[in-house]
Amino acid sequence: MDSFEIKKINAFFNKQFNTNGFTLKLDKNNTDSAEVYLNDEFLGLIYKDDEDGEIAFQFHMTILDEDLLDA
């Protein structure tokens, strides 16, 4: 995932959720993913999937059972 893609996805998240709180950071361990933050809180990872020339991005968010206690 390159910096242009990260900027575009970051803008997409902020526009879709009507905020400026989203930030994407390149995942240092995997060049095909980026970390997604909302107001400095880690939300999950977004992965680039390039299959048969079609590019898609998949967002993965893990919710721990203990996180649901405050919901």
Q: Where are the language model's segments positioned?
A:
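Terminal leader/tail segments of proteins
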Residues: 1-71
